[in-house]
Each structure stands twice: as structure tokens, then as C-alpha cells.
Amino acid sequence: MLSTQSHGTLSISSPGFATARVEVPAATNGPLQIRLEPASVIERIQVTADDERIPSTPASQFAINQREINLSGALTIDDVLRQAPGFSLFRRSGGLSANPTSQGVSLRGVGANGASRALVLLDGVPLNSPFGGWVYWNRLPRVNIESMQVYNGATSDLYGSGALGGVINIRTRILTAGSLDVEASAGNKATGATSFSGGKLFGNWGIAVAGQALRTGGYVLVPENQRGAVDTAAGTADLTGSITLSRALGPNGHAFLRLGSFGESRKNGTLVQINDTRIWSLDLGTDWSNAAAGDFSFRLYGSGENFNQNFSAVAADRESESLTNRQRNPSQQAGFAFQWRRSIGDYQSISAGFEGRDVRGHSAETTFNNSRITALVDAGGRQRSLGFFGNDTVRFRSWFFSFGGRVDRWRNSRGFSDRIPVIGAPSLNDFTDRTETAFSPRVSLVKRFDKGISVSASAYRAFRAPTLNELYRNFRVGNVVTNANAALRAERLTGGDVGIGLQTFGERLFLRGNLFWSEINDSVANVTLASTPALITRQRQNLGAIRARGIELSAVMKFARHWEIAGEYLLTDSTVLRFPANRSLEGLLVPQVPRNQVNFQVSYTEARWMFGAQGRFVSRQFDDDQNTLPLERFFTVDAEASRGVSEKVRLFVAFQNLTGSRYQISSTPVLTVGPPVLVRGGVRVSLR
């Protein structure tokens, strides 16, 4: 109900929606109905993430809201994120069919491997596996995600190890007085999924629950003309859930406690090769604001992970296989993070904080030859880290100057590698404890001009410490064996970027461009030691240096009220500069990094009908360090259309890989390919 005696303009805003401005005539007395339209990409690009550490450089952020998640056509969150420029997983794989160890994330061409070179946060808590750095994307219930922000570019000055290529910050839904959202779908390849999110407030207290059950029969990874008796569909069955208890701490603060659980069982494409994972997590956090003291945030978290996997050797004709290794990888982590931020007048903002983490894990293996046990192998260790950071941002008229840095110190201890053969003497090795330190500074400058133009420039250093998986765990994919290396050193990056953004035509058109350059010393790569038709042997080693440089271009346009189109282009030149141990690798392309990536999104949104499509082109890349195993270029399109049958119920149909492109996923050297056309139909229910 609105009552006014004079003419005026009423502005209403809500997260995820465009601000509505309505002219209110004089002498208005009665109800006023206002409809909020979903926020455009133009607005979303400029939204600062919930974690205040993420810098507000407009040329390097990409945001995805709940509406776009629904319109993407993708079932898993990693496939939704592929619309972000530079986002990629190891071996082009996805959460529906990939082994967990190949779901490490990379941004901006720094090179993908099993261990992510980007940090993934869920409400400020790291989501990367503490043991291996990869991400279990199916831990995230679709309907419980409010938004995702992707920051391209090194951010170790704020986040330390893991943020070598950038940060992905995922925010869950905000708890309201009472709500329940449910999505259920079913499709071909025996695929079905149900996701839900709900909660209720009781005075100052609140409780929220979220969960997801996903199952797919999957598809056969090997091309039809190369299949044998051992080849089966690569499917998965996942179950995840969480319960969150929250309490308001006065008008300016809140605290929460979240308990989560995740279970997954996968078939990896042959009769013998399977894996399963069990994860529990406990997160405790509090946020509090005070006009005089500033904003405070604290997180305390812990988790345990059990990852089990079988490896096999497949005959050349793929008619038989034999078990070679059965692994069990238990790991645990505990960590904390504290952050403080305060504005000084209207022209300065300072922030500081510290965080620490303790990770323990090992790989217990049973090796086989001709179905007989040959040895018991166990290797693992412990990694403790502590970091302190600070940042100062000063505004002078239309200039913004930011400088800061972070100091990290970590220690690898209790490292061991034991082998007890059935025949022969045991080998027991203890590794010397090692400590490393990294300083990660950053300087940034932003200039905002009239008419919606802004330019930015940044220079920085970053690092990534090797994971316990890289240090101590061996693995096998196809006929490729990759050995661990306990002597690995931290990767260290030096880089910079410059960017320009333009917002015009009444905020309906947004253009941006970014030039970036980075050099990574001691980059960890899988280096080929020997190659035969039956077996390729590799080891994780520190390369001398690699260089990644390129161009990012983005354009977004909203027109005719309901339509929006967007496109992104990433050109990356990522090459090996120096490797004294093997000069033949110098000048070659970094594995798993395509030179060209093009994305586009189209959406139509109105009260009843909604439609969205996203396309992706990826150019040729190589699967190996010697550039002898190419993966050819491909183009694919995902889409979704939905219709609201009432205010609370919406029906939808979703398609993945509409082009039917069986693009190449990996070459080990056996070729594996991507999924066929995937179709789902389902319903979304929202009760509020």
C-alpha cells in the first residue's frame, strides 16, 4: 500500500534483479504493483562477490545468476561454468562422466591438470579436494546456488596457494522466512536428477536444508570402431546433502553452522575401472559489521574424504583387461580464515586477514600382476600452511589505486613412501621435511571516464604449492602411468594485465577487453620418461618456465526488453619457455590449453516463456607434453526452454550437445570422446 501527496520516483532493488524505477503521480493512495525483471549480464558483471577480498576490476569478472543456471541446459555446475571465458577442466571432461581426478579447474590458459590452478569457494570455504585439488562438482545442488562469480587472473595476494589462475566464488541461496525450491528431471542415457533447497526462519534462528540425487547410466567413452569387450558405459550415482543452522547476531551480524555429506560411485568406462568417494564437511562462520570498527568475517572448517579407485591394463585389442592397482586415498583437512575490512571516509578502504590449513593424507595401494598381488604400497604426508594478507584501496576523483600483498609459509612433513613386495625385501623411505615461503604482491589501477568507459591495469605475483596427490600418489589412465614426485617445488607466477570496458546505449550494451601476460616458473607437468606401444611412463616434474599470454574479449547486449545476447573470445598462447632437463620440450605448447575459445549465450525471458542457449567452440590442443597426441577442435550447443504453468510451477526441456559432436576428450593414447546428444525433461517448483 502506497500513500503520497506529491509526485516522485520510487526505486526498488533486489539481489539478482534489475533496479526498477517507477514514476509515482501525486495524490497516489492505494496498492502499486511493480514487477522486477532479472538482472542483465551488464549489471551482473559489475557485482562484487560476497567475499570482499575479490577485487572489483571490471575487466576480469564474469557472473552467473540462478536464472542463467536454469537456462544453460547443463545438468552439472561445471558445464554451466563453461560459458565463462577461460574456464576448463583437465582433458575436456565433465562431471557426468569424468574421473574425479580429471576435474581440476583452470582459468586463463595457465594449464589444466588434475590439481586445480584456480580456487573454488562455497560461501567463503574452499571446495577443492584437500588431497588432490580437484573439485567434486556434483556436491553442489543446482537449486541451492544463488550465484557464481569467476575472477580471471592470479589472486594469491588475497587467497594464497590455489588461486594461481583465479577464483570461482559460489554463493548459496539466501534464507528467507519460508521457502522450498525443487527441481526434478529425467532424460536419455538413464539419467535422472532431483535437487531441492528450503528453509525457514524462527525469530532470530533459521534452518536450511539442501540436497541432490543424480544418477546416469552414462555412455561408452571409446569410439565405436575401437571398442572391445572391456568397454562399458561411464556412469555415476551421486547423493549430496547439507543442513545449516543460522542465528542473527543483532541487526548487523549472523552466524551459521553447516554440516554436509557427499557420496559418489562411478564407472570409469571398463568392467574393472571403478571409483567411489565419501566426504563429510563441517563449516562454522560468522559475519559482523560495525560502522566504526568495520566488517568482520570468520570461517572455521573441517572435512574428511575417502577416495577409492581401481586401475587396469587393457589389452591392445580391448578384448580383455587385468587389475593392476587398487588404491585407497583417505585425507582430512582443518582450516580457518579471518578477514577484516573498513572504509576510511569516502576515499579509502583497507582490509587485512590471515588464514591457515592443515591437510593430511596418504595413498594405500595394492598392486597386481596377472590377478595376483605383487606388493603393498603406501605413500603420503602432511602439509601445514599459514598466510597473512593486507590491501589498501584509495580513490582520488575518478582514479582507484589498490596495492597489497600476502605472505605464505607452508611445511611438507611426515612424507613417506613404503613398498612391501610379496617376494623380496621391503623398501621404506622417509622424506626430509621441507618448508617454503612465498610473497605475493599486487598493484592495480582503475580509471573511470565519462560515458561509461573504464580502463584498468594490474601487476602481480602468485604461487601454487604442490598437493599431497602430486607429491605422493601414482596413477594410471589407459596405458599411461604417471608417477609422483616428493621433490616438487611450488609453482611461481609473475604477470600483469590491462583492460578496458565500455557501457553505453542506456546500459544496454557492455563491451570489455583484456590483455594478459604471465610467466610461471617451476610449473608442474606430467613429463614423458619412456614410451612403448604398450605403456607410456610419465612423472610429475617442475618445468623450467611456461608463458601464457593472450586476449579476452566480451560483449553483452540487452534489447527488445526480453532478449539478451552475449559472447566471449579467449586467445591464448601458452608455451614452454625453458626446461633444462629436456630441451626438446622448449617451444612446445602447454598440454590441455587450446589457442582459441569462443562462447556465446542467447536468452529470452518473460513471465510465461523462457529460453536460453549457450554455444562453445574450442580449437585444437594437445593431450601430452611432447605434442604428439592432438585433440581436434569442436563446437557444441546446449539449450533449454521452459514454460510457467502457474506462479509456482514451471516445466522445462533441456538439451546438451545439440550438434551431436563426439568431440575428443583425451588420448592416452586410446581415444575417448564426449557425450552424444543428451535430452532431459522436468519440472521446477518454487514455494515462497
Label each region the model flagged.
Residues 78-129:
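Extracytoplasmic beta-strand/coil segments of soluble accessory domains associated
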Residues 13-18, 27-71, 78, 513:
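Short, acidic, small-residue-rich periplasmic hinge/interaction motif at the N-terminus
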Residues 246-262, 278-423, 430-431, 446, ...:
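Face-selective signature of the C-terminal outer-membrane beta-barrel domain
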Residues 199, 247, 457, 491-496, ...:
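Conserved C-terminal beta-signal and adjacent last beta-strands/turns
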Residues 157, 169, 177-179, 183-185, ...:
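Periplasmic-side early beta-strands and strand-to-turn transitions of outer-membrane beta-barrels
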Residues 296-311, 362, 448, 454-460, ...:
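Membrane-embedded beta-barrel scaffold of Gram-negative outer-membrane proteins
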Residues 395-401, 410, 510-512, 516-520, ...:
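Gram-negative outer-membrane beta-barrel transporters
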Residues 2, 125-152, 173:
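Short acidic/polar hinge/loop motifs at secondary-structure boundaries
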